[in-house]
UniProtKB/Swiss-Prot annotation:
GO molecular function, one term: rRNA binding
Organism (species): Pasteurella multocida (strain Pm70)
Reaction it catalyzes: uridine(54) in tRNA + S-adenosyl-L-methionine = 5-methyluridine(54) in tRNA + S-adenosyl-L-homocysteine + H(+); uridine(341) in tmRNA + S-adenosyl-L-methionine = 5-methyluridine(341) in tmRNA + S-adenosyl-L-homocysteine + H(+)
PROSITE patterns: SAM_MT_RNA_M5U, TRMA_1, TRMA_2
List of catalytic residues: C323 (nucleophile), E357 (proton acceptor)
Name this protein carries in UniProt: tRNA/tmRNA (uracil-C(5))-methyltransferase
Organismal lineage: Bacteria, Pseudomonadati, Pseudomonadota, Gammaproteobacteria, Pasteurellales
Length: 365
């Protein structure tokens, strides 16, 4: 079964999102939205499928979000062309080897614009030497067919990487290329084309900035790497170890000299800035050496907690990317007491869904 996309409805669906976000931001006197559309198909760079075993056959399935009924997926138009090519090639190879398909229950795909892909095979069994040998043969066969891939096996408390657990993406921001290491099973922006547009918008907002930038929740450095060119120094926080390691690689790979990553949560950083407690992880970093008058936040769906909102209000300029406009508006109730919205944007990261990615650029009143 092919999960068809209503491509002919794309423009009207995006217009509806624009209308909704405009209405949500209206109480805060936001200017007209800049709207950044997505490609209408092949826009998702990652996908996860359950595997359904049926009378000696097996295939990718997904579950209908409303009915929870499973349905077969032989191709997936919202995923990148590379993922579709891999889906088409991989399953026939798995079917020829019982060691590889026995108790296989899920396959995860992570692809890049740089034409690399990670395939993760998830099992309800312990992976042994026999599995590893079969997996090496599978990888060799896929390499022979022209795929640039990493193959990973996962089971309970077990992970086998045949080579490495990451791929290096290349994103272009206003004509300049940046390398981003993306680690399997870690967060990456799902829509790479729209991500590039988000980065360009953020760079444009912060052009001609003075002083330093603080970023909370930096992930693999997606934004801070591109924004570093606009600031004297950048200080960024992230809690997940794999993301911090990827960010450190990205800093070195892109020759960014003015960006420092520290591994702590936004809440912990707030405590450090307010002098509530000291952190060993900040040893050797002089927070007083930073003159951060701009802050960038890209929080989880829950938005910023109350203490972080207070921290953010201390900065003259606030760049806020949100994956949940409702919690963004909750935060704006407080932020707009001290700041005004200079620019606002809608990024269509998730076409054909109700999800909206929003950006606001706030300046102190």
């Amino acid at each position: 079964m092919q999960a068809l996309l209503p491509i002919e409805q794309y423009d009207s669906l995006l217009a509806e999102k624009q209308k909704k976000l405009t209405a949500l931001l209206a109480p805060f006197h936001a200017p007209a939205l800049a709207v950044f559309p997505s490609p209408v198909q092949h826009y998702r760079m990652r996908a996860e499928f359950r595997i359904w075993h049926d009378k000696g056959d097996f295939y990718h399935i997904m579950f209908d979000q409303r009915t929870r009924q499973r349905y077969r997926v032989d191709c997936f138009p919202m995923a990148s062309q590379l993922i579709n090519q891999m889906m088409d090639t991989l399953l026939p190879l798995l079917k020829t080897n019982r060691v590889l398909h026995h108790k296989l229950f899920q396959i995860d795909y992570l692809s890049t614009l740089s034409n690399k892909i990670i395939v993760s095979l998830l099992y309800h069994k312990t992976l042994d030497e026999e599995w590893e040998q079969a997996a090496k043969q599978l990888k060799a066969s896929l390499l022979q067919q022209g795929f640039d891939l990493q193959l990973i096996g996962r089971a309970s408390k077990q992970k086998i990487c045949l080579e490495q657990e990451f791929v290096d993406e290349v994103l272009t921001v206003h004509g300049k290329s940046y390398v981003y290491r993306q680690v399997e099973n870690s967060f990456t922006q799902p829509n790479a084309i729209v991500n590039q547009k988000m980065l360009e918008w953020a760079v444009d907002c912060t052009q001609n900035s003075e002083g330093d930038l603080l970023e909370l929740y930096c992930g693999n450095g997606n934004f801070s790497i591109a924004l570093a060119q606009n600031f004297r120094k950048v200080l960024a926080t992230e809690i997940a170890k794999p993301s911090v390691a990827a960010a450190q690689f990205n800093i070195a790979e892109n020759s960014i000299k003015n960006l420092q990553i520290i591994r702590m949560s936004a809440e912990e950083f707030t405590q450090a800035m307010n002098g509530v407690r000291e952190f060993h992880r900040l040893k050797g970093i002089d927070l007083n050496a930073y003159e951060c008058n701009t802050i960038f936040v890209d929080p989880p769906r829950a938005g910023l907690d109350e203490e972080t909102v207070k921290l953010v209000q201390n900065y003259d300029r606030i760049l806020y990317i949100s994956c949940n406009p409702h919690t963004l508006c909750d935060n704006l109730q407080h932020l707009c007491q001290t700041h005004r919205i200079e620019k606002a944007a809608l990024f269509d990261q998730f076409p054909y869904t109700e999800h909206m990615e929003a950006g606001v650029w706030l300046i102190r009143k």
